[in-house]
From Swiss-Prot:
Residues 586-627, 645-692 are annotated as: Disordered. Pfam families: PhageMin_Tail, SLT. Residues 645-655 have a biased composition (Basic residues). The lineage of its organism: Bacteria, Bacillati, Bacillota, Bacilli, Bacillales. Keywords: Coiled coil, Phosphoprotein. It comes from the Bacteria. Gene3D superfamilies: 1.10.530.10. To B.subtilis XkdO. Residues 618-627, 661-672 have a biased composition (Polar residues). Residues 12-59 form a coiled coil. This is Uncharacterized protein YqbO. It comes from Bacillus subtilis (strain 168). InterPro entries: Lysozyme-like_dom_sf, Phage_tape_meas, Transglycosylase_SLT_dom_1. The modification Phosphoserine is found at S970, S972.
Length: 1585
């Protein structure tokens, strides 16, 4: 069975409204804390005429309510009438609609129940529109759902809120029309003064942080930004001015030119201004380029080459000093950069860097660089040039140009690259031709003059927004000038108000204000927010969800109608603000004959307007606005609506970079969009003549306004709150705008009976909807929803008579008997009063801040006192004219919206409909609930599921425990068992004994083998060494003639067949071996020319006993060589055989022959033998020390890692199981806490306790097993050591146990590894023996230290390990693995910088590529790391190195210092280091035999042809030497011969099937090595890979 879950959601519309209310309260607080900004415009008469006409039409038609609400009063009441008709005559219902999205999914569930027993379905029931039919469908389908998981979501969307919101928005619009009654349009005071403040702050900051005075800052910034149209914002221009002043020290005209050019480049390149400033500063300081010249240079390069890699500005900043040293002009720099870029350079930095490198090298010449100059110009011209470098007669740019020109004439690309790299640096290796193009470009200078101005003009001309942007700049300039003037002029007024506020009298007055306002807020709080508490108290009751909707909405509207009118009404007290703006803005009435700046601006404005005609959007007159954009925004008209939307989306409307106040007035200001004002001025409103001149209603001069105020007189009454301010006296007379605040005093002291009169008498004090809405929202006993509607309409009319009419009208009585009846409300809003008090607590805190904010907001009271009375009377007359209009409308409203019978009918219909829809939803829920109860909320259902889970978990734990027991017992029986270890040692001992026995046997056989070998020595020479190189193949054409090489040469070799390259100076031992092989191929034999060898030998023989004594301390099995006298016997036998023949044929001195041909060679052999032994010992030691057993790796992978993996994963298994279960459990509200505690929590707790024991037991047993068996392991190790020592003592008669253990320690390690893991390796022995080829190749094995050095360098340079073989090959060929090697013979050494170290790098290459901190060229790791860096930069990969590439293609390593056999055509370097070599063609021709004889002679040997008669026996010289046999000294070396057999422990195994084969191979390897050493004399190492 599956799970079924139903979820009903009540869409929370109330919370969003509450958040809006909270935001209103916060804005109210900010308004009280911030400055009060008033704007006024006189449009009363026109609006009143429109209202009067519309009211007449309303009364003429028979309708319940003919009052429409629109967001633009200007559109006329025609739209209002249509909207009102829709509102009053339509059916007002709260529509609960259903959108059935569940049916399709239910059909799928019903059709697939047989296959979906464990599936998971989530049908969603979204209740939206027209519920009845859909709810029936849901009920039918739910009955079909069984064993599934469903989540129907019932969403109740109240469409009433949207309708009421629309009404509210239209009321707000109507209020806005009245609030802006006296707004003159144009500039808001907030934006003007904010602009002035921002400008003054910028100029002060720049002046304080630079060397420019404030006056010059303002003048230069305005000239650049406003007049020359440069820069993105005034602030950006001023900061650029500061940067350039600080970085260059320029002033006056030079600074202004730098700033303007820098700003234009920033716009042209769309670059960061600060980055442009840095580039200009560097060019000004180093190249002495003016702002205009720098701008022209950058603009020219940018137009012709772009901004390569975005580094043009950075290049100018970084390399200006290099350009200065080279004495380059701006035109030359531009031309060079463009040429180099078009030639293929990646960026400007590479080009400039090559210039800097050349400039350094031309003044600090090394020998190789001098040679490069001589190659290009000749010695004589080079000398002149160097002289010119020193005395300055040849500049850097001239020398670079000449070098580039000379290089272009070098046809050989390789030679050109070598010279250019030497003179220009490594950038040439990367770029090549672009460097030369750049250098040649220096020869000419680009014409950059005027480039910046042309590009900037084209940018402006092609931008369609340029006129708009220029208009905005003009407006910003005007706004800045006005704001600066206002802030400067109001300084004394602020001083006066500050003095009053800080005086004792002022403090007392403010305390009284605070107390009275707090009392007003408390009284309001008694009836505020009654709807919200009811919603909170009953929100969780799902069954009454529909009943909550309608009351909550009504309460919501009430809440909105309280705070908004309070905010806007109190925040805008004094609709007489028209006088404020008129007074602050100087009179600009045009006068004939004047020529002031203001007059010129007005004249131009009028002229432009006249040319545009009636369609002009720019109003004429002194207060006209620019065309572009909206300067101010009104929260109660189009601008305000859009502004609210923008704020809701989290967006802010800001100026480009300046102060936000440039575009946005503060939140407390009431403003109107310039677009609406323009329509007002042009007269394009609904119901009016678009061509009618409305300027008379807009342009009201200060004198006209003043006269109107005087004529009307003042009738304001002062209330309680601000009454103390009436007696402010001389302090208040000097504070502007204080009179406006005094107007609000008429509002204080009102009560339930006289509220209408009090609010109405304020006139413009609470303009617009604030007046009417306050009637319905603020005063106790008056309802909110209808009061707000009435207040919105009443506020449009104004006047104290309106308030009186409402106080005494039947409207209020009707309202009190319906919506405002205590009993009627108490039935629907239980528990509201207590919550209202808590909701209004913030108001008292808000008003408490008024005291502090008055200090910084009220202005000159004296000015206001003089003007207030006239303005007040004038405003009162305007309100009275609207009062009569209201009387005609009042009757219609009374019979509809304020009729108890009318409302009663509407409410009953809504209530009954909502109840019927909820009943349908309830029945659906009952059906769903039944299904859920039988599955997710059924203990029986859960019990079935849990049992299977529980049993499965138990089985898994049982299996885990049994597995661990098996593992534990297995470990205890093996690793911790003394018996087990003893068995393993036995198998190791058997292998060791077998090997030792074989070695011993070899030792015995070597002596006899040596005898046979000596006897067959000459036979080997005759028969050749075909077993190494195979038999000869078919000979190619005989075109090669061979030759003798005495100096390094590049030559074709092997082009006509096989050839031998035989060294005669570098490695004579190998040369002899190759000579013997070459002779064999040519059908010849080689014998030692004793005379030549002895005469060239130079070093006398030393005592063989002394030499051998130096190497008797061996670390390998030692072979007795005392039987060398047997070799002498073999020689003697051959001497005797032909002795008589020699006597008869030759008359010689027997004593001399004996000394030359027998004694000297034997002594030489004895003298050489210690070296052979020493090399064998050292090689063996290196092989042993570089070979690991792999025990650590085995234990890590086979033992430690499996356990660690289990530990790592166990946490995720446990956490995943618990988290998954918790997620499933918490997603369903089952109410089965007791069941879960019993069947889930406790079993898991028990599992947790048990598993803790299992885990600790597992690890504990493992540790205890290791520790408890420690003694047995120690004993086994001791026994192992004793047995190894004993075996070696007994078998080989060795008396140095420590050395024995050191030498053969790895056999024990191998045995341990094989005991842990026996592996059959079928071809092990063959693979090991195959490594002997390394000995014959002359390369030998790389020592362990070299390998470690190279691996360390590879890791330091983060190079792939695949480079190791190639690097080892290079190290072996270049230095032979010697980190201290220094080459003193090649061309580098002659030039003064020999190649050194492991990889034979020269100092300059090492320094160019060494890693930080690796500065020792003789340190092998440092040297190898630098070589790797050089290979990467030069060849990219190790496989591209010539020597490695040659070997990869089957050829030899490039360079033949050791000689070798050439089997195919190739190009190679021979005679390296001026070492002599012979190249001998492998053919039986005269040339080949001649060259072979010459090579043998150079090596102190002779060549014989066995095919000639008489040559089958010894030569006469050899026979003569035998006559000294009676004096022959038989010698016996007391030393030994050591052979290195290298093993790699990771590949050696032991088992029965391959033991004998392994031993045999080892024996054979020993025999082969010894035979090779005797016959050839090479230095070989038996390397077992």
């Amino acid at each position: 069975m599956a799970k079924l879950t139903a979820t009903f959601e009540l869409h929370d519309k109330i919370s969003r409204k509450l958040r809006m209310i909270q935001g209103n309260a916060e804005r109210l607080k900010r308004a009280a804390n911030g400055p009060l900004i008033f704007e006024a415009e006189d449009r009363t008469e026109r609006v009143m005429r429109q209202i009067d006409r519309s009211a007449n039409r309303l009364t003429a038609r028979a309708r319940l309510l003919e009052m429409g609400l629109d967001d633009r009063v200007s559109n006329g009441l025609h739209s209002i009438r249509q909207q009102a008709e829709d509102l009053t005559e339509g059916s007002h219902e709260v529509t609960v609609s259903v959108n059935d999205q569940a049916t399709p999914r239910f059909r799928l569930i019903r059709g697939g129940l047989t296959d979906l027993n464990s599936s998971h379905a989530e049908p969603t029931v979204s209740v939206r529109d027209h519920a009845s039919n859909q709810l029936d469908e849901i009920r039918r389908h739910v009955t079909d759902v069984d064993s599934e998981h469903a989540e129907p979501t019932v969403s109740i969307k109240d469409r009433a809120s949207a309708a009421l919101d629309a009404i509210e928005a239209k009321i707000d619009s109507l209020k806005g029309a009245t609030i802006t009654l006296a707004v003159a349009g144009g500039f808001s005071a907030g934006s003007i003064m904010g602009s002035g403040k921002s400008t003054m702050s910028q100029d002060a900051y720049v002046s304080a942080t630079s060397n420019v005075n404030k006056k010059d800052v303002a003048k230069m910034t305005d000239q650049i930004y406003f007049n020359n149209k440069a820069g993105s914002s005034r602030e950006e221009v001023s900061l650029s001015l500061r940067n350039l002043s600080q970085q260059t020290g320029a002033s006056k005209k030079a600074l202004a030119e730098l700033t303007e050019s820098s700003s234009k480049i920033a716009q042209l390149m769309n670059a960061d201004q600060a980055e442009v400033d840095r580039a200009f500063s560097s060019m000004y300081n180093n190249l002495k380029l003016s702002g205009k010249q720098s701008g022209d240079l950058i603009a020219y390069v940018y137009r012709n080459a772009g901004d390569q890699a975005d580094d043009l500005l950075d290049t100018m900043n970084e390399y200006s000093s290099t350009f200065k040293d080279l004495k380059l002009t701006g035109g030359q720099i531009a031309n060079a950069m463009i040429k180099g870029t078009k030639g293929g350079a990646r960026n400007f930095d590479n080009l400039a860097d090559s210039m800097r490198e050349f400039n350094i090298r031309r003044t600090e010449m090394s020998d190789s660089q001098v040679d490069a100059f001589k190659t290009l110009f000749g010695a004589k011209e080079t000398k002149k040039m160097f002289k010119g470098f020193k005395d300055g007669s040849i500049s850097g740019e001239e020398s670079l140009f000449r070098v580039a020109k000379a290089l272009s004439k070098v046809k050989d690309k390789t030679k050109r690259a070598a010279i250019a790299t030497e003179l220009i640096g490594t950038q040439y290796e990367d770029l090549k031709q672009p460097i030369l193009d750049m250098a040649e470009g220096i020869g000419t200078s680009a014409k950059t003059s005027g480039e910046l101005e042309r590009s900037f003009t084209k940018l402006r001309d092609n931008n369609p927004m340029t006129p708009v942007n220029d208009a905005m700049r003009d407006f910003e300039s005007i706004s800045k000038d006005m704001g600066t003037s206002l802030l400067t002029g109001l300084g004394p007024a602020f001083d006066k108000i500050s003095s009053f506020i800080n005086s004792k009298e002022g403090q007392e007055k403010l305390k009284e204000i605070k107390k009275d306002i707090a009392d007003l807020g408390e009284e309001i709080g008694d009836k505020l927010n009654v709807a919200i508490e009811w919603s909170v108290n009953h929100w969780d009751d799902l069954k009454t969800a529909i009943k909550v909707v309608i009351p909550s909405l009504i309460g919501l509207i009430g809440y909105l109608k309280i705070l908004r009118p309070l905010l806007k009404g109190i925040g805008t007290v004094g609709s007489d603000a028209a006088g404020v703006i008129r007074k602050l803005i100087p009179k600009r009435t045009p006068k004939a004959g004047t020529n002031t700046q203001s007059e010129r601006r007005n004249r131009n404005s009028n002229r432009n307007a006249s040319t545009r005609g009636r369609e002009s959007k720019t109003a004429t007159g002194p207060t006209s606005l620019p065309r572009s954009g909206s300067l101010t925004y009104c929260c109660c008209s189009d601008g305000g609506k859009n502004d609210r939307i923008r704020r809701r989306r989290g967006k802010r409307v800001l100026g480009r970079r300046g102060n936000p106040n440039r575009m946005n007035p503060s939140d407390s200001s009431i403003a109107v969009s310039s677009e609406r004002l323009e329509r007002r001025r042009s007269g394009r409103t609904v119901g009016t003549n678009p061509t009618r001149d409305s300027r008379s209603a807009i342009i009201t001069t200060r004198s006209e306004l003043y006269s109107a105020g005087r004529a009307a007189g003042g009738t304001s009454k002062f209330g309680k709150v601000l009454s103390p301010l009436k007696s402010v006296g001389k302090f208040a007379k000097g504070v502007p705008l204080l009179g406006t605040a005094l107007a609000a005093t008429d509002l204080i002291g009102m009560n339930k009976d006289n509220v209408g009169e009090k609010i109405g008498s304020a006139g413009g004090g609470l303009a617009g909807a604030a007046t009417g809405a306050a009637i319905g929202s603020v005063i106790p006993g008056v309802g909110t929803a209808i009061g707000g509607l009435v207040g919105g309409i009443a506020g449009t009319m104004g006047g104290s008579s309106l308030g009186k009419a409402f106080d005494g009208s039947e409207v209020k009585k009707k309202l009190n008997s319906t919506l405002f009846d205590q009993k009627w409300w108490s039935e629907k809003w239980s528990g509201i009063k207590s919550n209202a008090k808590t909701s209004i607590n913030g108001l008292s805190d808000t008003w408490s801040n008024v005291k502090e904010k008055v200090k910084s907001t009220l202005f000159n009271s004296e000015w206001w006192s003089e003007k207030w009375s006239g303005v007040k009377s004038w405003a009162q007359n305007k309100w009275n004219s609207a009062s009569s209009v209201w009387e005609s409308v009042k009757g219609k409203i009374k019979s509809t919206l304020f009729s108890e019978k009318w409302w009663s009918g509407k409410w009953e219909g809504v209530k009954s409909w909502a109840q019927s829809k909820w009943d349908s939803a309830s029945s659906v829920w009952q059906s769903v609930k039944g299904k859920l109860k039988s599955t997710l909320f059924s203990e029986k259902w859960w019990s079935g599921k849990w049992e299977s889970v529980k049993s499965w978990s138990k089985n898994k734990w049982d299996n885990a425990k049994s597995i661990w027991k098996s593992v534990k017992s297995s470990i205890s029986e093996t690793l911790f068992s003394k018996k087990w270890w003893s068995e393993k040692w036995q198998s190791v001992k058997e292998l060791g004994s077998s090997i030792l026995g074989g070695v011993k046997e070899v030792g015995g056989k070597v002596a006899s083998s040596a005898k046979k070998t000596a006897g067959k020595a000459w036979g080997y020479v005759k028969s050749g060494v075909n077993y190494l190189f195979g038999s000869g193949k078919e000979k190619p054409k005989k075109h090669a003639t061979g030759g003798y090489i005495t100096k390094p040469t590049i030559s074709w070799i092997g082009e006509a067949g096989k050839e031998f390259v035989i060294p005669v100076e570098n490695n004579k031992g190998r040369g002899k071996m190759l000579l013997s092989q070459a002779a064999s191929k040519l059908g010849m034999s080689v014998v030692d020319d004793i005379a030549s060898a002895s005469s060239a030998g130079g070093e006398p023989a030393t005592s063989p006993l002394v030499r051998s004594a130096a190497v008797t301390a061996s670390v390998s099995p030692i072979i007795d060589t005392s039987s060398l006298d047997e070799q002498a016997t073999s020689f003697g036998q051959q001497f005797t055989k032909s002795f008589d023949q020699g006597i008869r044929d030759n008359v010689v001195s027997m004593e001399a022959w004996k000394q030359k041909n027998v004694g000297q060679p034997m002594n030489n052999l004895i003298s050489y033998s210690p070296n052979y032994g020493k090399q064998v010992v050292n090689g063996y030691a290196k092989g042993q020390n570089s070979t690991s057993t792999g025990t650590d790796g085995f234990l890590q992978t086979k033992v430690k890692m499996p356990f660690q993996n289990t530990v790592n994963k166990s946490s995720s298994w446990g956490s995943g199981t618990i988290k998954g279960f918790a997620s499933g459990q918490n997603s369903s509200q089952t109410g089965t806490d007791q069941y879960v505690s019993t069947h889930i929590n406790k079993p898991f707790i028990r599992s947790k306790e048990s598993s803790n024991g299992w885990g600790s037991g597992m690890i504990g047993n493992f540790v205890s097993g290791m520790t408890s068996k420690a003694s047995e392991v120690n004993e086994a190790a001791k026994e192992l050591a004793k047995k190894v020592e004993k075996a070696f003592r007994e078998e080989l008669d060795i008396h140095s146990p420590s050395r024995v253990m050191m030498s053969l320690g790895r056999f024990a390690s191998i045995g341990i590894v094989k005991g842990l893991d026996s592996v059959d390796v079928k071809k092990f022995a063959e693979k090991q023996a195959g490594s002997l080829a390394a000995a014959y190749s002359g390369m030998g094995a790389v020592s362990g230290n070299v390998k470690q050095w190279l691996m360390a360098a590879i890791m330091a340079t983060k190079t792939p390990m695949s480079w190791l073989p190639g690097l080892m090959t290079i190290a072996q060929h270049e230095s032979g693995g010697n980190p201290k090697a220094i080459n003193l013979w090649d061309s580098n050494a002659k030039a003064g910088h020999p190649s050194q170290g492991l990889m034979q790098t020269i100092p300059s290459t090492f320094n160019a590529h060494k890693l930080p901190g690796m500065n020792n060229i003789l340190n092998p790791i440092h040297n190898a790391a630098a070589a790797i860096g050089y290979i990467k930069s030069r060849y990219g990969s190790i496989n591209n190195v010539p020597g490695i590439r040659s070997m990869r293609h089957g050829g030899p390593y490039v360079g033949y210092a050791n000689g070798g056999l050439i089997t195919k055509e190739q190009i190679a370097r021979v005679g390296e280091g001026n070492k002599r070599e012979w190249i001998i063609p492998e053919e039986r021709g005269i040339r080949g035999r001649y060259l072979l004889a010459q090579a043998a002679k150079a090596l102190g040997m002779e060549v014989t042809d066995p095919s000639e008669k008489g040559q089958t026996e010894l030569s006469s010289g050899q026979v003569t030497a035998a006559t000294t046999g009676r004096n022959q000294t038989t010698f016996k070396a007391a030393g030994g011969k050591e052979v290195i057999i290298q093993f790699n422990g990771d590949q050696h195994f032991h088992n029965d099937q391959d033991m004998n084969s392994l031993v045999a191979k080892i024996k054979q390897a020993l025999v082969d090595e010894l035979e090779q050493d005797i016959n050839i004399g090479t230095k070989g190492v038996v390397a077992f890979d």
